[in-house]
Regions:
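A recurrent flexible, glycine/aromatic-enriched loop bordering the glycosyltransferase active site
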Residues: 142-160, 177-178, 235-238
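Conserved donor NDP-sugar-binding/catalytic core segment of glycosyltransferases
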Residues: 97-129
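Membrane-embedded multi-pass helical conduit in multi-pass membrane proteins
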Residues: 249-321, 357-369
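Glycine-rich, basic loop-to-helix element that forms the pyrophosphate-binding segment
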Residues: 63-80
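Short aromatic/hydrophobic "clamp" motif used to bind/position activated sugar donors
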Residues: 85
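Short, flexible, basic/aromatic active-site loop/helix in glycosyltransferases
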Residues: 117-118, 132-150
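Short, well-formed alpha-helical segments that are part of the catalytic scaffolds
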Residues: 12-26
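Catalytic donor/gating beta->alpha subdomain of glycosyltransferases that bind UDP-sugars
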Residues: 173-237
């Protein structure tokens, strides 16, 4: 008999998501409980969902204040009694056979510590969502389709053995709205077990576009807040890289301001700004042609804005919140295997070189005028 506790922290408390989760097919000889943690005291719990709470198979916990998904998951872990814990977000629609898929994987591979599947987004509906796909910022949501194993997985769709969790919990230092806490949690488990999570490309949940696909960069700024905290917790997965577009703009515009004062002209600032921005978009366009094809390369502008918003959050955290000056050009290897660092450095170096070259070209052009 396999026992599974499904832990769902919920701020939204929407029946359209919660009910399909607790109505997933339960395989034979599998004992499943659903632990829902209501994390929004100001939101009334829907009656149609409340009628399904029996405090045996469907158990509802209510936070007295909004604590965030990470602390809410800890409530679930503290009350979990099952052999396995399945984390699901409250804004996904799981495939009907999700638990069956995980149960079969557990039976086939009882010695593995955990498994994770894909979180699938709809087809892009506008230029912004096409840019999200093009820039690869969502890679880890569907990485189970083309990776074999990984040290961590998004908590939208991952199951892990309870005995391997032990006393490990989601750290409270991470932002309430999310970012980095899932990486930290699973890396703690990896440090303890030295075993990675196995990928299941047939374990699927479906996620709608945030804000219905409307342009919004706050989420990606916020992600980097939490990610930046990982640098000091897991320094073995950090590395230095060439300045990104936001770092280059910040320091380039700062130093060019002295030339503006000296020349009594705003021209140096404009030259630096144009050189960096044009270089970034040009190289990103070329990169996308090489790896994504001409069709997706037209969304290089959109993808660059998304990545830049993420870089803004990272620079703010390093310099303002954490006051880590030496962390400015520091990056976190999210694959946690150091296999992709060389690739990242090559493209970052090409981009940084383009900033300098295009700035010089613009300067010489204006000088001739």
């Amino acid at each position: 008999m396999i026992s599974i506790d499904v832990i769902i922290p919920s701020y939204r408390l929407q029946s359209e998501y919660l009910i399909p989760i607790i109505q997933m097919d339960i395989p034979f000889e599998t004992n499943v409980r659903f632990l829902i943690i209501a994390d929004n005291p100001n939101e009334k719990i829907p009656e149609d969902f409340l009628s399904l709470v029996d405090n045996q198979k469907v158990i509802l916990f209510s936070n007295k204040e909004n604590k965030g998904a990470h602390k809410s998951r800890n409530v679930g872990l503290d009350n979990s009694k099952a052999d396995w814990v399945l984390f699901i977000d409250d804004d996904v629609n799981p495939s009907k056979n999700l638990i069956l898929t995980y149960a079969e994987a557990i039976i086939r591979n009882p010695n593995e510590i955990g498994f994770f599947g894909e979180t699938i987004f709809p087809k892009p509906k506008n230029n912004f969502t096409r840019g999200l796909i093009a820039c690869d910022i969502l890679t880890f949501f569907f990485i189970a389709d083309y990776y074999k194993e990984l040290k961590w997985a998004p908590t939208s769709n991952v199951i892990i053995k309870n005995t391997e969790i032990g006393n490990i919990r989601f750290k409270e230092i991470f932002p309430k709205n999310g970012g980095g806490e899932d990486i930290d949690f699973f890396l703690q488990i990896y440090d303890k077990t030295k075993k990675e999570l196995q990928c299941l490309n047939n374990a699927k949940v479906y996620h709608n576009w945030w804000y219905n696909g409307k342009r919004n960069y706050i989420r990606f700024i916020r992600w980097s807040y939490g990610d930046t905290l990982l640098h000091t917790i897991f320094p073995q997965f950090t590395y230095y890289n060439f300045p990104n577009v936001i770092e280059s703009l910040t320091f380039g515009l700062f130093f060019s301001s002295f030339f503006c004062i000296y020349t009594k002209s705003i021209i140096p600032l404009i030259i630096i700004f144009l050189g960096i921005v044009i270089g970034e978009f040009l190289i990103e366009f070329i990169r996308m042609i090489m790896y994504k094809g001409l069709k997706m390369s037209v969304y290089a502008f959109e993808g660059t804005l998304v990545r830049a918003s993420n870089d803004i959050g990272r620079l703010y955290m390093q310099t303002v919140r954490l006051k880590r000056i030496f962390g400015i050009f520091e990056r976190f290897d999210h694959f946690c295997d150091r296999k992709h660092i060389k690739h990242q450095r090559i493209w970052a170096g090409i981009k940084f070189s383009s900033y300098i070259i295009i700035t010089i070209i613009i300067y010489n052009f204006i000088l001739k005028k």
